[in-house]
Amino acid sequence: MSTDQRKGWAILKTTLIIFWIALIISGCKQGSQPAKPADTLTGGTINISVDESFKPVIDEQIKVFESSFPQAKIIAHYKPEADCLKDIFKDSATRMVIVTRGLSGKEEKFFKDSINFTPRWDELATDAICVIVNSQSKDTIFTLERLQKQLSGSMENGQQIIFDGLSATSTVRFAIDSILKGKRFDTSVVRAVTSSQAVLSYVAANENAIGLVGISWIGNPEDTVQTKMLKKVKMAYVECSHCTDSPYVKPNQLNIMTRRYPLVRGLFYILKENYAGLGSGFLNFLQYERGQLIFRRAYLGPSKMGFAIRNVMINQKLKKE
């Protein structure tokens, strides 16, 4: 081989080595780049867990959101509140939960230590626990003391109180925390069914039953399913300790927003997402005008937008049953 040929082979060999090194470096750089998120503010698919007592209003929110953004798919899993919270802590696929409380300081620290950021959370609307009775019942007025006595078993009148489960649900937790003030209820006077819809059905079929359900299931007079159910059950009046015009009130929108009705609670989101993904897009929808109007139209109290409350004179008296 001549000197020129050897030089040519050396140059070719060097060129090939440089090419392969460049190719390897390029591949390493591409491999080290983070993968692009599979979802955006208005597109993709995410899973959320929702307290079952909020199903009617969240179904409507998702329906309107998805019709506005056809590339977006929100898969909602309705379940007891405790299971929703387990999902946000343990299930990496769950992007958001909608429940009746936010995170405690201890829970925020857990997330900060484990995933290096704290999920966002806040109240979106105010909800109420509605006391319902059979349409034929004459017993439609309740004080908080009476509810406490019946739940604790110290008042025996043959009535059963119907819950959407004996543990893990937000309705049960509310009854223990806000009515019984931390005490446990007497399981001999309460009955557990599988869902809020099952509570309504049971009370509709049993004249001596009292049910506790979220207002989202029964408080919307524009929902034909709910108005049909209101022919079989009715909302009871509950004592208002600071009302001067009426000692007992129903959980209508005004009484929820002004907290004249005593059994009021919040509807909260917890969002475990640290980029501009579909969870953030759905949250933006819920907390701004369109989502807040849907909460209002469902007769809950919107928490993120102020709506005027006007005083009007109406000729309404408490019905004598």
Can you say where each PLM-predicted feature lies in the sequence?
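Ligand-binding pocket segment of bilobal, Venus flytrap-like solute-binding proteins
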Residues: 171-240
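Periplasmic-binding protein-like
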Residues: 116-130, 228-268
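Extracellular/periplasmic juxtamembrane helices and adjacent flexible linkers that interface
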Residues: 268-321
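C-terminal motif of bacterial Sec signal peptides marking the signal peptidase cleavage site
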Residues: 24-27
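N-terminal segment of the mature folded domain
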Residues: 33-151
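Ligand-binding cleft/hinge of the Venus flytrap
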Residues: 63-68, 148-191
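N-terminal secretory signal peptides that target proteins for export/translocation
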Residues: 1-11
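A bilobed periplasmic-binding-protein/Venus flytrap-type ligand-binding module shared by bacterial periplasmic
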Residues: 129-137, 266-275
